């Protein structure tokens, strides 16, 4: 299984190129299903081994260059300078490649303390040829690498040429001083002789047992639907799933542009290429056969769909039929593995007509497409058990006297602090825009404008649909703002963090300085967001990672955690909307509910019946579930 591979081993597409003195490829061997292994030979020298299933090729990791700009897309290049050869890795699960590169970098750095043997010494040793895969990274490797770095960082002492440090991973000194623009900073900078940051042992954020169960089910090839209440780590798990699958055949999608941006994907409608999907099936199949769209459908082996609750049943059935038709397969969804995520007790499907839209689980093809239904039970966003219980009750439409009393009492909460006001969650987009515009106008002082830099101004509408930041941002001193990107998790500078503009830097740019609720004061600089467009095109937007935060819509708040939030539920018009709004708050103390009416708390009865059936089936299937979970899931609420 893919998930059980060693961190020093990759399964991917590999190309081995022999280069002429000008750096051009004169011979190329392509291995579609190759294995790349990091190991040591009989002299404990580090070796990169490429195996095509027949005969291995070994490359000495001595004088080489590492190009990792596209590591996030599962690609990297290792160039062996003396041999005039380069190994190009592609279609590798990004998370696995990231760990492989860190292992290579730190292990190589740690091995520089030993003096290399000469060819004569190797002949005299007479050792039989050997190859052993390197062990996983340990603390001693990091400590050894840091010790060597500290020596390099020490003041230079006069020395003879014979005392020069042995080869650098990045090649000769000229290349180190002027690194190529396609060299990513992560593993390369870690080995830069002039800049030696302290290394730490790379540790991925640990998955819970139930999250691990979902990941293992996905890696075993099952079609999986996993659900859970707000704050159970669904989006976090989806990112781990995306990073664990081969990029070329994996398509991450979501029902909304904002949700798609969170997982680094595109909208489901953009992937499908059939517009709104309202056309007859035959016409939709024709639309999906256009060259750019057809490539999506034929190359896709793993389709991820986030926020499935907002996907309508008829649209899902059409996609399933299109997949079978285009891929010429009778298997459900044309044999594509489905990884579906969402909470049907949150926002329902969007429909423009008066006719009621059905949920995905009510579609004809749902049961034959989904092999496993799994539920995340552990709430991670909130830690207060009382607040968690309140949210669980609201989620299923159960409003007790105690819940009502707590929410009515919250109207008196004073949640403003250090000039940072509560963000008002609104049910309608128009209310949000009007509130933010009026509040900004009421502030004294000059408006500062910040225009986004887009990679393709002709496709600005596509970017707008997926971007968490606007084309034009207007700010004043005192403007209430919200961070739209994780900048420094340790300091609390995370997506959704609240702040206020305190001043602007002098000069043409006039960058804003923001004081955040966590206590940090930060000068905000432009950040870049990448988006996937139809046809495999990548788009980008550079903008300040801020948005006005006097008000925000409930739809736009999905996936966010807010420190101080004010909610008016008077105009709630959809089932699940009240729950989504309330569950954005990190704590009950940071929540203020105005004009609360228990009648606005609604849960769709069809969804409740579906979840009850899902839980019964899960209990019946528990013996097979244990293969993935290791132990029975515990429930934290009773319906």
UniProtKB/Swiss-Prot annotation:
Q: Where does ATP bind?
A: 228-235
Q: Which UniProt keywords apply?
A: ATP-binding, DNA damage, DNA recombination, DNA repair, DNA-binding, Helicase, Hydrolase, Isomerase, Mitochondrion, Nucleotide-binding, Nucleus
User: Which InterPro entries does the record match to this protein?
Assistant: AAA+_ATPase (IPR003593), DNA_helicase_pif1-like_DEAD (IPR010285), P-loop_NTPase (IPR027417), Pif1-like_2B_dom (IPR049163), PIF1_helicase (IPR051055), PIF1_RRM3_pfh1 (IPR048293)
Catalytic activity field? Couples ATP hydrolysis with the unwinding of duplex DNA at the replication fork by translocating in the 5'-3' direction. This creates two antiparallel DNA single strands (ssDNA). The leading ssDNA polymer is the template for DNA polymerase III holoenzyme which synthesizes a continuous strand; ATP + H2O = ADP + phosphate + H(+)
Chief location category: nucleus
User: DNA damage: present as a keyword of the record?
Assistant: yes
Q: Does the keyword Isomerase apply?
A: yes
GO cellular component annotations, sorted alphabetically?
mitochondrion; nucleus
GO MF annotation list: 5'-3' DNA helicase activity; ATP binding; ATP hydrolysis activity; DNA binding
Query: Taxonomically, which superkingdom?
Result: Eukaryota
Q: Which residues bind DNA?
A: 577-596
* Subunit structure as annotated in this protein's UniProt entry: Monomer.
- To which protein family does this belong? Belongs to the helicase family. PIF1 subfamily.
Q: What is this protein called?
A: ATP-dependent DNA helicase PIF1
Q: Which organism is it from?
A: Danio rerio
Query: Which gene is annotated as encoding this protein in its UniProt record?
Result: pif1
């Amino acid at each position: 299984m893919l998930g059980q591979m060693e961190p020093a081993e990759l399964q991917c597409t590999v190309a081995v190129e022999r280069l002429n003195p000008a750096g051009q490829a004169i011979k190329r061997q392509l291995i579609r299903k190759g294995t790349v292994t990091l190991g040591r030979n009989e002299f404990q020298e580090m070796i990169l081994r490429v195996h095509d299933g027949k005969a291995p090729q070994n490359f000495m990791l001595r004088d080489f260059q590492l190009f990792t700009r596209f590591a996030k897309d599962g690609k990297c290049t290792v160039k062996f300078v003396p041999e005039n050869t380069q190994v190009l890795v592609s279609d590798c699960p990004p998370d696995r490649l990231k760990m492989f590169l860190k292992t290579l970098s730190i292990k190589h750095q740690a091995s520089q303390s030993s003096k290399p043997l000469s060819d004569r010494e190797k002949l005299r040793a007479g050792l039989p040829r050997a190859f052993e895969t390197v062990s996983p990274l340990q603390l001693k490797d990091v400590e050894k690498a840091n010790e060597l770095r500290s020596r390099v960082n020490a003041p230079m002492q006069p020395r003879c040429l014979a005392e020069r440090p042995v080869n650098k991973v990045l090649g000769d000194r000229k290349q180190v001083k002027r690194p190529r623009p396609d060299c990513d900073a992560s593993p390369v900078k870690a080995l830069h002789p002039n800049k030696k940051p302290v290394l730490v042992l790379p540790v991925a954020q640990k998955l819970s047992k139930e999250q691990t169960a979902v990941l293992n089910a996905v890696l075993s090839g099952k079609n999986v639907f996993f659900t859970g209440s707000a704050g159970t780590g669904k989006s976090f798990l989806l990112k781990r799933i995306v990073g664990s699958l081969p990029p070329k055949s994996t398509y991450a999608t979501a029902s909304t542009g904002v949700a798609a941006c969170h997982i680094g994907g595109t909208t489901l409608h953009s992937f499908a290429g059939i517009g709104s999907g309202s056309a007859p099936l035959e016409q939709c199949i024709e639309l999906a056969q256009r060259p750019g769209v057809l490539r999506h459908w034929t190359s896709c082996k793993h389709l991820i769909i986030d926020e499935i609750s907002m996907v309508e049943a008829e649209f899902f059935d059409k996609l399933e039929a299109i997949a079978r038709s285009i891929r010429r397969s009778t298997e459900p969804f044309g044999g594509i593995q489905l990884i579906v995520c969402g909470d049907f007790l949150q926002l329902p499907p969007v429909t423009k007509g008066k006719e009621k839209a059905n949920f995905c689980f009510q579609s004809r093809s749902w049961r034959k497409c989904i092999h496993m239904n799994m539920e995340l039970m552990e709430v991670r966003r909130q830690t207060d058990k009382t607040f968690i219980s309140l949210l669980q009750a609201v989620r299923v439409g159960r409003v007790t006297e105690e819940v009502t009393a707590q929410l009515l009492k919250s109207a008196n909460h004073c949640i403003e602090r250090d000039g940072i006001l509560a963000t008002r969650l609104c049910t309608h987009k128009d209310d949000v825009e009007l509130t933010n515009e009026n509040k900004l106008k009421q502030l004294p002082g000059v408006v500062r404008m910040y225009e986004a830099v887009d990679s393709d101004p002709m496709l600005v509408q596509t970017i707008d649909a997926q971007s968490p930041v606007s084309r034009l941002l207007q700010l004043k001193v005192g403007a209430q703002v919200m961070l739209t990107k994780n900048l420094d998790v340790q300091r609390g500078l995370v997506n959704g963090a609240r702040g206020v503009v305190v001043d602007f830097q002098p000069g043409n740019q006039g960058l804003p300085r923001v004081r955040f609720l966590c206590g940090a004061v930060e000068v905000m600089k432009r950040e870049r967001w990448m988006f996937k467009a139809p046809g495999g095109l990548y788009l980008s937007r550079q903008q300040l990672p801020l948005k006005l935060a006097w008000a925000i819509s409930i739809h736009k708040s999905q996936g966010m955690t807010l420190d101080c939030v004010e909610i008016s539920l008077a105009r709630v018009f959809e089932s699940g909307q009240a729950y989504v709004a309330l569950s954005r708050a990190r704590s009950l103390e940071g929540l203020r509910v105005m004009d609360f009416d228990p009648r606005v708390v609604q849960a769709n009865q069809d969804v409740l019946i579906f979840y009850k059936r899902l839980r019964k089936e899960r209990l019946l299937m528990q013996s097979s579930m244990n293969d993935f979970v290791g132990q029975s899931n515990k429930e934290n609420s009773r319906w």
